[in-house]
Amino acid sequence: MNLLCDHMLGSLATWLRIFGYDTFYPNEMMNDKDILQVARNEKRLLLSRDHALLLQAKKLLIPILEIQTTDLTEQLQLILQKIPPNETLFLTRCTLCNTLLHLVPKEELKNKIPEKIYQTQDTFWTCSTCKKYYWMGTHYHHMKKRINTLRNNHLS
């Protein structure tokens, strides 16, 4: 299922991407009308805390999920409960722009990443849209730990 987080849910959008959900997050220039248009045109489930936006979406028959808490962990647990994730998609999307990541040969990154990272890591991914590079460093391990914690809480 494709998702759309409104402006108030930026951290949630990032984490949903980490969990592999196709998650649109609007840029700062987009207004409510633009957000609703994307949700409708791309058949996305609108996630929002904004009651007025949710009401407009309902009138347009756009599927919605109201997020009632500001706590990120609770938000993620709600989504995991309502829309179970596909574990094969974990850590496959760019956290910045939502594009699917691609494996890139280590040799192509020789002068594009810090030397220490190049020497200590073997597997790299890149985003073809924003050109960000990813590898299994400390951020990766922290994300995996949080994924496992949330997943285990969801299953219990």
Named regions from a protein language model:
Residues C94-C97, C127-C130:
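Short cysteine-rich clusters marking metal-coordination/redox-active sites
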Residues F90, S128, N152-S156:
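Surface-exposed, charge/polar-rich loops and edge strands
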Residues N111-F124:
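Short linker/helix segments within small regulatory modules
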Residues T99-P105, W135:
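Short functional micro-motifs and their immediate structural scaffolds
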Residues K106-K112, H139-T149:
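Short cysteine/histidine-rich zinc-coordinating motifs and their immediately flanking basic loops
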Residues E87-L91, T120-T123:
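Short metal-coordination and nucleic-acid-contact micro-motifs, chiefly zinc-binding Cys/His arrays
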Residues M1-L89:
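Long, charged N-terminal interaction/targeting segments
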